[in-house]
Design a protein with these regions (language model features):
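Alpha/beta-hydrolase fold nucleophile elbow
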Residues: 154-164
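C-terminal catalytic histidine-bearing segment of alpha/beta-hydrolase fold enzymes
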Residues: 247-297
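Alpha/beta-hydrolase active-site loop
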Residues: 129-152
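The feature captures the conserved acid-bearing segment of alpha/beta-hydrolase catalytic domains
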Residues: 184, 190-247
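Short beta-strand element of the alpha/beta-hydrolase
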Residues: 71-80
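N-terminal cap/lid segment of alpha/beta-hydrolase-fold proteins
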Residues: 31-69
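Short glycine-enriched nucleophile-adjacent loop
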Residues: 168-179
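Cap/lid segment of the alpha/beta-hydrolase catalytic domain
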Residues: 82-94, 100, 110-136
Length: 297
């Protein structure tokens, strides 16, 4: 029975790596005339390789591809960390948010980092070293981009990396890495809170300061005033610490304060209702990078 189970598992991984049998979908969007427009796309779940010691780790990822052959510019969306065991966290899809990029001609990939969902390895975290945590998470973004570079429909010269909550910290840590084709990064309510560390807020500010000194790309930061994780004035402190150290393209960083959003502005990206709040400024950021952001019909 064990040999049969291993065989079935191997076959499943081969299928995932080959990206066979994609799931087709469609979404209702509004065109310029206010009418519903139907958009087709493909959703695929893959297990992508990450080099690790002593052996390779496979990361679960969701890939959304617009209809057509491409090549399509790429958006990477990095997930946050839900309470509880990371291995029990569900696969991130952010379907409503992903569709906004799909309908503008972007492929979207959402990797589950090491130890999350069906990704292999153990979750890297738990210590009070927030800066190191972010850098270790950023390795998974590199592995994701390396995998997407093998897909013929992806334009690897036009990449934007986005992250929410813990994924925002991951994204800003990744911004210290010079990866060809990455043009900018967006941080939605990014950070990491460890209440077992009495000085976690100072460590978080220091982590962003360190990232700022090494960052390589323009960035847009999106935070609110009633964030259950990052109370005011912490978002401003994190941003200012980053910007004070940033040079070159990274000095082109901007903080968008969305004010109060519902009961918790930490959800401004993950909640469907938040899309109209941030989408116009995200569009402006894309255009500032020389990227298109007009919705197709």
């Amino acid at each position: 029975m064990r040999s049969v189970a291993r065989l079935l598992c191997s076959l499943a991984l081969v299928t995932a790596f080959a990206m066979l049998a994609p799931l087709c979908g469609h979404a209702q969007t509004a065109n310029g005339n206010g009418k519903a427009a139907r958009m087709r796309f493909q959703e695929q779940v893959v297990m992508l390789p990450k080099a690790a010691i002593p052996s390779r780790i496979d990361l679960e990822a969701t890939v959304f591809k617009p209809a057509g052959d491409g090549p399509f510019p790429l958006v990477v969306i990095n997930h946050g960390k839900a309470p509880g065991r990371p291995a029990m966290q569900g696969r991130a899809r952010f379907p409503a948010q992903s569709v906004e990029f799909l309908r503008r001609g972007y492929a979207v990939v959402l990797p589950m980092r090491q130890g999350f969902a069906r990704s292999g390895g153990a979750y890297v975290g738990g210590s009070c070293d927030i800066e190191a945590n972010g850098m270790m998470q950023a390795d998974d973004v590199v592995a994701t981009l390396d995998f997407m570079a093998t897909q013929p429909y992806v334009d690897m010269e036009r990449i934007v990396v986005i992250g929410q909550s813990h994924g925002g910290l991951t994204t800003m840590a990744f911004s210290t890495i010079g990866y060809p084709g990455v043009l900018g990064v967006i941080n939605f309510a990014g950070g990491l809170r460890n209440l077992n560390c009495p000085d976690w807020e100072e460590r978080l500010v220091d982590a962003f300061a360190s990232y700022g000194g090494l960052a390589r790309y323009p960035s847009l930061w999106v935070y609110g005033d009633n964030d259950s994780y990052w109370p005011v004035p912490l978002p401003g402190r994190m941003f200012n610490a980053f910007k004070a150290r940033a040079t070159g393209p990274a000095a082109q960083s901007r903080l968008l304060d969305v004010g109060e959003f519902g009961n918790d502005s930490h959800r401004v990206f993950s909640a469907r209702e938040g899309i109209p709040v941030w989408l116009p400024e995200v569009g402006n950021f894309f255009r500032s990078l020389g990227l298109p952001f007009d919705a197709g019909t």
